[in-house]
């Protein structure tokens, strides 16, 4: 029995634990899981190993960090270090997107190294296997794709991206109308290239019932990939993106009927003014399914600083209802991220999530803001560091540029606004 099915009968211990952490009633949370409005990614064999994480309606915004090798840079030890660094700095989940080295061994090592849910994109592995046989990626058949999915589920991944919603109709829109950047989803491009080469419908769409059987057997959460996500703000909200969204909504219904948890992936590069509409449309078409967005990135001209751009878009998206933010690092569009990039990406995305939760009136966010305000009023620097999203950086600044008076900082010194006012109030007494 899957967790979704359990929640239709009772309140599982996993759900009770999440409810306590989130400050919601267990019965309400179980109902949302049963309805598909909240997902709890945890493979059937890993429920006791993975820290339970709820993603969706009424819960704090969660963040994901991507790690993984490439054909250019393949250091499994580094990827394990990156995964641990991401979790240490507050990532709620990790995805292994490896395309270089022993993919299965890397996946298993990352799953063993962290205690949060781990996701993957199996079609990458299917493509890599074809390349290693000296053949083109498009030479794979549907069995190659499905075997990769099955293998990842057998290995115990908690959630996986499956690009099942890109159909010939959506692909035709791209080919006929054109796009500034075509298809930028790596998994989406692999599937689309296969469809073009074989002049055939997406085998992941046509075999979705079989994928559901596998997911139900292992209780793996499906993350319905957005192959047609815009890679430029110029391509946002075009016909192809919307056609795929409609199919994602159809697949959400089929997942729920099968008792399989599902979330929906979204863009991508989207102008700031269009982000609220993107979220509202997804929530309507997909009947409240958890929304997992990459960014969104609201401008194309910030290479090297895309973690900042994505945090801006992510805060807007999350405030309007996105549930799950995939981090973007400073290396996005440029190179494989290193540990420092991963940390910066996680911190930027945590800021976006906290800003959104503050605006949404989440109690934990208000409490943390109140505690920080109190620490600042008291000029309690150690407490401020404890409350900071990243305690190390503010402590470093203060130690590197110390003030003359211990209770002040080197920005204002004796002209500190708080101290001036407090002294005046004390004198008045």
Swiss-Prot record:
Binding annotation for substrate: 66, 95, 124, 163, 185-187, 226-229, 265, 292
Q: In which pathway does it act?
A: Cofactor biosynthesis; thiamine diphosphate biosynthesis
Domain of life assignment: Archaea
Q: Which InterPro entries match?
A: ThiC, ThiC/Bza_core_dom, ThiC/BzaA/B
- In the record, what terms sit under GO molecular function? 4 iron, 4 sulfur cluster binding; carbon-carbon lyase activity; zinc ion binding
Q: Sorted alphabetically, which keywords does the UniProt record give?
A: 4Fe-4S, Iron, Iron-sulfur, Lyase, Metal-binding, S-adenosyl-L-methionine, Thiamine biosynthesis, Zinc
Query: Main EC class of this protein?
Result: lyase
Keyword Iron among UniProt keywords = yes
Q: What does this protein do?
A: Catalyzes the synthesis of the hydroxymethylpyrimidine phosphate (HMP-P) moiety of thiamine from aminoimidazole ribotide (AIR) in a radical S-adenosyl-L-methionine (SAM)-dependent reaction.
The protein, known as: Phosphomethylpyrimidine synthase
């Amino acid at each position: 029995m899957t967790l979704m099915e359990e929640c239709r009968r009772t309140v599982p211990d996993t759900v009770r634990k999440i409810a306590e952490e989130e400050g919601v009633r267990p019965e309400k949370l179980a109902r949302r899981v049963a309805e598909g409005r909240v997902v709890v990614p945890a493979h059937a064999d890993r429920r006791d190993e993975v820290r339970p994480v709820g993603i969706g309606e009424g819960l704090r915004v969660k963040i994901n960090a991507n790690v993984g090798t490439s054909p250019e840079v393949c250091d499994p030890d580094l990827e394990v270090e990156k995964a641990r660094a991401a979790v240490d700095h507050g990532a709620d989940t990790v995805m292994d997107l490896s395309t270089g080295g022993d993919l299965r061994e890397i996946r298993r090592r990352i799953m063993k190294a962290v205690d949060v849910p781990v996701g993957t994109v199996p079609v990458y592995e299917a493509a890599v296997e074809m390349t290693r046989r000296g053949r083109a990626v498009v030479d794979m058949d549907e069995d190659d794709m499905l075997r990769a999915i099955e293998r990842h589920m057998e290995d115990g991944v908690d959630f996986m991206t499956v690009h099942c919603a890109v159909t010939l109709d959506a692909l035709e829109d791209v080919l006929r109308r054109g796009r500034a950047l075509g298809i930028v989803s790596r998994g989406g491009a692999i599937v689309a290239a296969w469809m073009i080469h074989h002049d055939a419908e997406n085998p992941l769409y046509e075999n979705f019932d079989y994928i559901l059987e596998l997911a139900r057997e292992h209780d793996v959460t499906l993350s319905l990939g957005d192959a047609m996500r815009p890679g430029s703000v110029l391509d946002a909200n075009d016909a192809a993106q919307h056609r795929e969204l409609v199919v994602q909504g159809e697949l959400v219904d089929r997942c729920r009927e099968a008792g399989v948890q599902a979330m929906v992936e979204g863009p991508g590069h989207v102008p700031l003014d269009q982000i609220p509409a993107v979220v509202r449309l997804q929530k309507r078409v997909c009947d409240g399914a958890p929304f997992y967005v990459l960014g969104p990135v609201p401008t194309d001209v910030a290479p090297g600083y895309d973690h900042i751009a994505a945090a801006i878009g992510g805060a807007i998206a999350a405030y309007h209802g996105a549930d799950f933010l995939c981090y973007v690092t400073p290396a996005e569009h440029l190179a494989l991220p290193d540990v420092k990039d991963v940390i910066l990406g996680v911190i930027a995305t945590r800021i976006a999530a906290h800003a959104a939760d503050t605006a949404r009136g989440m109690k934990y966010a208000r409490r943390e803001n109140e505690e920080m305000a109190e620490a600042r009023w008291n000029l309690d620097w150690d407490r401020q560091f404890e409350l900071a999203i990243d305690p190390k950086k503010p402590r470093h600044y203060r130690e590197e540029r110390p003030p003359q008076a211990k209770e002040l900082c080197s920005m204002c010194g004796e002209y500190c606004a708080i101290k001036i006012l407090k002294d005046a109030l004390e004198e008045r007494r």
